[in-house]
């Protein structure tokens, strides 16, 4: 043990000397050597059950212990320098603070070697950086939210250098590094205060690597401190938490342990979170208290479920088999689909940063641990087996990828055939036959097929087509041979039994269009009323029917007998007018028209286009105002940090489609304002 302590002190002196150099390059080289020096000294793999340096129960931490944390844990008093993170871990491992200095040195080495992993390669990197932002303040502030990554990296470098000396203060990244050093889980317990930033600190932290054979043990460490202004919590130290049933102090006789158990029960009764204890201290109502308590418990459960799902997703990716969305939803139904694709996109970005030629996801090719590689030189004995393993995984993935490509080609060909035959069906029916195709892919293929001209290949070669375009005569553009070839182009035969549901859907849409057309002909409804009554009918049908209705010529009125007799009266000046005007080429043969009669046709008045255009402009302006109100509503709610869900947004603006809502939401999150007024 003396040799171990001397080795720790010597390597600590080397690290302190290296901190005088600019940057972390010299310190990283020393850290690689320190890791090799400390490698022969093993660390405890199980928590200590007997506390040798017993100093009592921390009453302040016991009062701050939250209600959603694991029950039956007891905060122990630790004395030392700094905020006692490594002292608390040493108390849990060996029952005293004798191991704290070595844990501090090992954590510094871990942070130096795996710096890029902790800053941007870990799944919880964003959460850890948010916790580091808020570690200096007790509430969420705009300055901390806008703190750039370069400033955080500078703070990280300064923290690493400061950790090489006694009495330094640990941050959240020290907790992550300590979990990787001990290869165990650390449950970070944060009091029920500062609720906006509490989720970043109150969480289960997993190590970077751990043994696959056994489940890693879990150490419980709590943030303790003082309460300021009644409800603002200022953390300044860490406290070790140990199970009361496993606690042994000195010799395990019953006389010494009975008072401890009794005092623990009394303190648990006094410090339970109840409305009667808090109503005099804080100005809150009973409903608010129970709502906060319920939300904390629900958030804790959701956080645990989310972390388990994320850890399972990463583990399956490292093993080279990325589970599809359907299987993932069966295992974790509470995780939404958007979260699944967000995690998948993170892994895709990691693969593209590591040097991949494409952005496609190839599980098993590279993992986080391989990407954020250590500056150490890799050992040569395992290179052959590792290469064989990669070759096997590559062959397996190539087979799966070819199978997926074949399936996608089949789905695309099927959709194109249906659109050519004018029997396209919605996405929900398409998904039953091809469940692996996403909605966006379906609509992209559908748009391509709608723009595709199926008779282009039968109309001749490209040279003939170019010559036809150059010719000026319309007869040359439409030759009989080309017309016959277009007319005799093959058509896709459709089975009646297979497409019975499609025909029923087509007839339903047709009847709906006929009903909408009858409504427009009977009553001149506005565009907004039309969309409210028939939301599934396209807007182009509305304007087509309106224009055809207004342009419809009026039928000539049936003349009565008296009007007919009056109209048959021929004036003698008629023929003279015709002669003087020279209307016809046969002016000399006017006498042959003597026996003809002249009918006076009613005057034809063209429809009033000004009224039509005015109504069209009014409808367009109303639609623009409607969209402007929707954009303004979303932008205001986004600035108030109370962004509505699509269900709530649809209740206010029922005509806005879902895709438009998510397009505006994405623009706001990217910093693009919707309304510049």
Swiss-Prot record:
Keywords: Developmental protein, DNA-binding, Nucleus, Transcription, Transcription regulation. GO terms for molecular function: DNA binding; DNA-binding transcription repressor activity, RNA polymerase II-specific. The keyword DNA-binding applies. Residues 356-376, 458-490 are annotated as: Disordered. Residues 458-472 have a biased composition (Basic and acidic residues). GO terms for cellular component: chromatin; nucleus. CDD domains: OTU_VRTN. It comes from the Eukaryota. The keyword Nucleotide-binding does not apply. InterPro entries: Vertnin-like (IPR038822), VRTN_OTU_dom (IPR047273). GO terms for biological process: negative regulation of transcription by RNA polymerase II; regulation of transcription by RNA polymerase II. It is found in: Nucleus. Functions as a transcriptional repressor that modulates bmp2b expression during dorsoventral patterning. PANTHER family: VERTNIN. Belongs to the vertnin family. This is Vertnin. It comes from Danio rerio. The gene is vrtn.
